Amino acid sequence: MSGEKKSRHVMYKKTSRDKAVSVYLGKRDYVDHVDSVEPVDGVVLVDPDLLKGKKVYVTLTCAFRYGQEDIDVIGLTFRKDLYYARTQIYPPVEDPKALTKVQERLMKKLGNNAFPFVLEFPDFLPCSVSLQPAPSDVGKACGVDFEIKAFSTNNLEDRIHKKNSVRLMIRKIQYAPDQPGPKPRAETSWQFFMSDKPLHLTASLSKEVFYHGEPITVSVSVTNKSDKTVKKISASVEQVSNVVLYSSDYYIKTVALEESNEKVPSKASYNHTFSLLPLLAYNREKREIALDGKLKHEDTNLASSTLLKEGTDRTVMGILVDYKIKVTLTVSGLLGDMTSSEVSTELPFILMHPNPDGGAKESEQEDDMVFEEFARDPLKGELQAEEKEEEEDDEK
């Protein structure tokens, strides 16, 4: 209807300090659909008078940051580029390609000195993830991040000064699959020494995919035909982060836990339902918990599960995140608590954000464009870290 108000479509903009180059993006988050990844489609606005004959390039970089700068003293750099792509934007060197809806609207708005660019993500890169530092840690967190950078130069071999460049942090993200798998279910039996019959444990979930902030219901059934007594039952959500760089390291962190002190004596059965809620709010003091990548000082959440394209090598560099429910029975021993043992089983599941409705058609909407500057006023410590890194880039 003509009387309806148009929705607002935020366009993100950032300009170099010499005012010669500005980058415009229609969004900051790019979705990895497992089989394909949304490309970065943007526009660069140049001022030919200020460029004075310089060429303009745009790069896409995926970097793994170690987070702790003092690691450099042992001869290792604390940043490794996992992927780097560069294209010349001005003067144009390629035949113009079909424009996306966002590019069409931006170029119509910005005029003749606007030039489009498209940069593709390869399908082997991890998503934006970071490991939570301890409260006392300083500097950038260990993790994977993505950056768009535009700069002007006479020669690619020359040092790139920060006044001639503009950097924009973006994210590569994934959403929950549209077709989840079967309901997770696991069972185990344990035969104790000097006990004729086993202890049987069954655990199940109502579904495979859970959304951030959604309680996870775990159904547990214990059939104790052994001569032992089950003293305690616990259910936990474990986050498993596989950090792959020069070696493969695993970090297993409990992010939610519930216990029942209900005893299950010999020859008895017991059924119980646990409700677990894995939230970052309950885990802010824990170091090395994986978090979804964030932009500047925005808040984030526990990292989403990593979905990989079939056939992808799980040793791809970066951080891969999985989740599992672990159900544990603590069983009495011959000498009481001193010799108690544990019986456990695990249920892998997926923790992600739902795919937002209408997200696929965002670029086709005829809405009002609103320009928003990429923030130059983050928290003081983060601004100092960014400026320090830019100075280091200048020195390379």
Curated annotation (Swiss-Prot):
Q: Which domain of life is it from?
A: Eukaryota
Stretches for region Disordered: 375-396
Protein source organism:
Xenopus laevis
User: What name appears for this protein in its UniProt entry?
Assistant: S-arrestin
One matching Pfam family, short form?
Arrestin_C
> What biological-process terms (Gene Ontology) are attached?
G protein-coupled receptor internalization; signal transduction; visual perception
Q: What is its main location?
A: other
Function of the protein: Binds to photoactivated, phosphorylated RHO and terminates RHO signaling via G-proteins by competing with G-proteins for the same binding site on RHO. May play a role in preventing light-dependent degeneration of retinal photoreceptor cells.
